[in-house]
Amino acid sequence: MSLTKEFKADVIKQFGASEKNTGKSEVQVALYTRRISDLTGHLQLHPKDKHSRRGLLMLVAKRKKMLNYVKNIDIDRYRKVIAELDLRK
């Protein structure tokens, strides 16, 4: 399932300070998380799809880098994002 405009708007409202703040790190992590979950579901149906698996690994790496950035800037924001997205760190 792709990211719809409505879903993106909801994520921006939830994690961003305003509706126009799409570049905030928390917003980007939330969008990466949704794309990762979509690709994970796709790979469960199509286990031999190696190109999508590579894309999934690249998204996981991007999310990890973004989470490390948030953790280095403000640990409280990091913990809040981890709790809201139910990530394992």
Swiss-Prot record:
Membership in a protein family: Belongs to the universal ribosomal protein uS15 family.
A GO molecular-function descriptor: rRNA binding
Any one Gene Ontology BP term: translation
Cysteines paired by S-S bonds: none
InterPro entries, alphabetized: Ribosomal_uS15 (IPR000589), Ribosomal_uS15_bac-type (IPR005290), uS15_NS1_RNA-bd_sf (IPR009068)
Keyword annotations from UniProtKB, A to Z: Ribonucleoprotein, Ribosomal protein, RNA-binding, rRNA-binding
NCBIfam families, A to Z: S15_bact
Segment forming the signal sequence: none
Gene3D superfamilies assigned to the protein according to its UniProt record, in alphabetical order: 6.10.250.3130, S15/NS1, RNA-binding
Gene Ontology cellular-component terms listed: cytosolic small ribosomal subunit
Full protein name: Small ribosomal subunit protein uS15
Designated gene of the protein: rpsO
Coiled-coil annotated residue ranges, if any: none
Subunit-structure text: Part of the 30S ribosomal subunit. Forms a bridge to the 50S subunit in the 70S ribosome, contacting the 23S rRNA.
Keyword flag rRNA-binding: yes
Function field: One of the primary rRNA binding proteins, it binds directly to 16S rRNA where it helps nucleate assembly of the platform of the 30S subunit by binding and bridging several RNA helices of the 16S rRNA. Forms an intersubunit bridge (bridge B4) with the 23S rRNA of the 50S subunit in the ribosome.
